């Protein structure tokens, strides 16, 4: 009995260490609506960082670029290249949208690892990266869906919907289903990767608090940047596809 109770106590201890709570939220009531307060707080912080960086970038441009100006110009050229590669020659109007998506997701992902959110105590739940919440990733994916529908309809008019019966009307249900799976795949891919990364770091810090979590945190920073690039690239690809035709 002593051996059995000892084993049970060990299992309970391991359960307590790895029992990371997911899904608790701090709610705000705005009118008749209930919103996730912690997501709004962290999103506002990310937006403030982006607006502050943009203000610094354009406040005093130099003929001979400074190191900071070179950095922001490099970021802009990178976003332009991604947009042009995926959308084609008509990429220009979509650079702000793709750039906003990429930078918001990139800074949001990195904020989860670099900003000490846990210093701010909430009545329920805790602060984390905005992209750690499924509501944020679904909202970004739905914005992408609206964007590629708008791109297709603005270029082709109602003829855009003809793609659903190409190459044969038999594929109509599959083609319609495809447009529903695009935002789902975008949102769940981003949410799953960011949540899993933060949970792995939290569990490792609980088990081995000093050295072991550091390489995982650096790997998380790398994968966070890759996830932002994947989301922006796929968003641009969907927009380009809606403008060119069904593939």
From Swiss-Prot:
Localization, UniProt: Plastid, Chloroplast thylakoid membrane
Top-level taxon of the source organism: Eukaryota
Keyword Plastid: yes
Alphabetically ordered keywords of this record: ATP synthesis, CF(0), Chloroplast, Hydrogen ion transport, Ion transport, Membrane, Plastid, Thylakoid, Transmembrane, Transmembrane helix, Transport
InterPro entries the UniProt entry points to: ATP_syn_F0_a_bact/chloroplast, ATP_synth_F0_asu, ATP_synth_F0_asu_AS, F0_ATP_A_sf
PROSITE patterns xref list: ATPASE_A (PS00449)
One GO location term (cellular component): proton-transporting ATP synthase complex
GO function term, MF aspect, one: proton-transporting ATP synthase activity, rotational mechanism
Residue intervals passing through the bilayer: 38-58, 95-115, 134-154, 199-219, 220-240
Pfam short name (any one): ATP-synt_A
Coiled coil: none
Record keyword rRNA-binding present: no
Membrane topology: Multi-pass membrane protein
Reported function: Key component of the proton channel; it plays a direct role in the translocation of protons across the membrane.
PANTHER family according to UniProt: ATP SYNTHASE SUBUNIT A, CHLOROPLASTIC
Assembly behavior: F-type ATPases have 2 components, CF(1) - the catalytic core - and CF(0) - the membrane proton channel. CF(1) has five subunits: alpha(3), beta(3), gamma(1), delta(1), epsilon(1). CF(0) has four main subunits: a, b, b' and c.
Family note: Belongs to the ATPase A chain family.
Protein name (Swiss-Prot/TrEMBL): ATP synthase subunit a, chloroplastic
Source species: Daucus carota
Name of the encoding gene: atpI
């Amino acid at each position: 009995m002593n051996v059995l109770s000892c084993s049970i106590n060990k299992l309970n201890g391991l359960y307590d260490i790895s029992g990371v709570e997911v899904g608790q939220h701090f709610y705000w009531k705005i009118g008749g609506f209930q919103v996730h307060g912690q997501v709004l707080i962290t999103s506002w912080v990310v937006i403030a960082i982006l607006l502050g960086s943009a203000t610094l970038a354009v406040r005093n441009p130099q003929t001979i670029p400074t190191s900071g100006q070179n950095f922001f110009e490099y970021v802009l050229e990178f976003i332009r290249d991604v947009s042009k590669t995926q959308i084609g020659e008509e990429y220009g109007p979509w650079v702000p949208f793709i750039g906003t998506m990429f930078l918001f997701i990139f800074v949001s992902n990195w904020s989860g690892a670099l900003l000490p959110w846990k210093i701010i105590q909430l009545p329920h739940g805790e602060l984390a990266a905005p992209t750690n919440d499924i509501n944020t990733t679904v909202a970004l994916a739905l914005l992408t869906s609206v964007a590629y529908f708008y791109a297709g309809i603005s270029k082709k008019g109602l003829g855009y919907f003809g793609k659903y019966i190409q190459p044969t009307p038999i594929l109509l249900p599959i083609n319609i289903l495809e447009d529903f799976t695009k935002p789902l795949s975008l949102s769940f891919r981003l949410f799953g990767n960011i949540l899993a990364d933060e949970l792995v770091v939290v569990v490792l810090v609980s088990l081995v608090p000093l050295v072991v979590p550091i390489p995982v945190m650096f790997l998380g920073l790398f994968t966070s940047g890759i996830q932002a690039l994947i989301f922006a690239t796929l968003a641009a690809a969907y927009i380009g596809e809606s403008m060119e035709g069904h593939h």
